[in-house]
Amino acid sequence: MYKEIYLVDDEDLVNTVNAIHFRRMGMEDKLKSFTNPELALDDLRFRDDPNVKTLILLDINMPEMSGFEFLEFMMLEDFPETNKVLLVTSSESDEDREEAKKYDKYVKEFITKPLQIEHLEEFLQGSYS
């Protein structure tokens, strides 16, 4: 089971809606929400235990830093594989899907917005088994 869940999207409303999904599943105590991906990266870098099993819902298109740039930092800094990423995006671009494959060490799903609670539940059930 994930000990921490990071919501990383430049739109606060999107993070709020995604947080509601997790609250409905009784996971509100695990949530951390960021509208600035750089702050999310810093939080991941400087945690007490970097090996905590963490789920990161990551938007691709953000003004400060794209989701792919975020993933590039994770790769360059060799973040532990206990960090699993769900790319959540409004893009259905084949190019974005191909780009995501470069980060398959971390990226476990590519989900089109809006995030459906059923899809999230399926992913969580599959990742726990």
Give the positions of each predicted feature.
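Conserved acidic segment of CheY-like receiver
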Residues: 3-13, 18-22
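Active-site beta3 strand of CheY-like receiver
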Residues: 48-57
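Short amphipathic alpha-helix used as the core "switch/output" element in two-component signaling
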Residues: 42, 68-79
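C-terminal output helix
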Residues: 114-124
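Alpha4 helix (beta4-alpha4-beta5 surface) of REC/receiver domains from two-component response regulators
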Residues: 69, 81-83, 92-109
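Receiver (REC) domain active-site loop signature in two-component systems and cognate sites
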Residues: 62
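Conserved sequence signature across two-component system core domains
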Residues: 8-10, 34, 56
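Helix N-cap/capping motif at the beta->alpha junctions
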Residues: 33-42, 67
